[in-house]
């Protein structure tokens, strides 16, 4: 008879042999989800014997799904971002560590601005960026904006889950159109837009290509379609000396910088992610 720890170890081994990079983390998540226990509870009952065969069956089923390419975040329905539990499903992209760079820079810039501040999170998806900002900047008001009503439903779930409904709202908008007047003006606009060149989508890992929403990936022929549209249509919502920050793909930072300069931005900065890749571009507008 297996203990919970035995189940974790066997799950980890299966994932490792299958080439899953984060096999340790994912094994813990799988056993936690399959058993209905928190990770903390699993630590306290690691030597307890499993008497419920349903848990073993659940683990086997989850492993099959994972080895077929389904992301673990979609299987368990949640991922952690900037210390916040973020609900996810196939309507939204899974929060990435790379996106924490965009969030960190926005938070650092907001700390130097007089309160209260207003932030617009365009192409919000799960809302992870705007929610992390709201959780870390007291008095900050955040609007999560996305064209997808399914994504906005996830945003609202995450607002409730993280008790941020008082200072965060979610709104359906199309970044290809002029912004609605009711939005007002903002200190900062953050955006992690679709930026994969269309011809590259078929080359993506199966866990991304076959599961994550195409509309959150497809950046047009050159991957820069949304950067052009947003700087053209949405810059007018920034206050004097307001700031726009974009996450971008590998090799895109210089092009995004040029697009922002053409739109009238100055003091443009490029920030690297933890792998040394140019990942975030920010600029000020007067």
Q: Where do the language-model regions lie?
A:
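Conserved Class I SAM-dependent methyltransferase catalytic core
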Residues: 221-284
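Non-catalytic accessory regions of SAM-dependent methyltransferases
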Residues: 1-47
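Conserved SAM/SAH cofactor-binding pocket of Class I
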Residues: 100-203, 229
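Conserved hydrophobic residues forming the short capping helix/wall of the S-adenosyl-L-methionine
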Residues: 15, 110, 159, 234, ...
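Active-site beta-alpha loop architecture of Rossmann-like, nucleotide-cofactor-dependent enzymes
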Residues: 73, 196-199, 251
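Conserved AdoMet
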Residues: 32-109
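Mobile active-site "lid"/loop adjacent to the S-adenosyl-L-methionine
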Residues: 195-225
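Helix-to-beta-strand junctions that scaffold the AdoMet/dcAdoMet cofactor pocket
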Residues: 164, 212, 238-240
């Amino acid at each position: 008879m297996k203990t919970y720890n035995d189940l974790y170890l066997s799950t980890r081994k299966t994932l490792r042999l299958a080439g899953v990079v984060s096999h340790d983390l994912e094994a813990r998540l799988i056993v936690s989800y399959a058993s209905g226990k928190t990770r903390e509870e699993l630590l306290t009952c690691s030597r307890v014997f499993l008497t419920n065969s349903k848990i073993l069956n659940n683990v086997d089923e989850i492993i099959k799904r994972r080895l077929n390419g389904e992301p673990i975040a979609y299987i368990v329905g949640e991922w952690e971002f900037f210390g916040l539990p973020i609900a996810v499903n196939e309507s939204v992209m899974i929060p990435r560590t790379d996106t924490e760079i965009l969030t960190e820079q926005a938070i650092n810039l907001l700390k130097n601005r007089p309160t209260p501040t207003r932030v617009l999170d365009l192409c919000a998806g799960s809302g992870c960026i705007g929610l992390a900002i709201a959780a870390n900047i007291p008095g900050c008001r955040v609007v999560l904006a996305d064209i997808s009503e399914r994504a906005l439903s996830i945003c609202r779930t995450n607002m409730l889950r993280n008790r941020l409904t008082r200072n965060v709202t979610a709104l359906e908008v199309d970044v290809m159109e002029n912004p609605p007047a009711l939005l007002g003006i903002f200190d900062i606009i953050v955006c992690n837009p679709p930026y994969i060149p269309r011809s590259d989508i078929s080359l993506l890992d199966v866990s991304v290509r076959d599961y994550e929403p195409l509309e959150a990936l497809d950046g047009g022929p050159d991957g820069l379609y949304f950067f052009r549209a947003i700087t053209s249509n949405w810059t007018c919502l920034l206050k004097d000396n307001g700031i726009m920050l974009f996450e971008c793909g590998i090799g895109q930072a210089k092009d995004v910088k040029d697009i922002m300069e053409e739109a009238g931005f100055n003091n443009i900065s490029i920030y690297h992610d933890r792998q040394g890749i140019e990942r975030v571009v920010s600029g000020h507008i007067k």
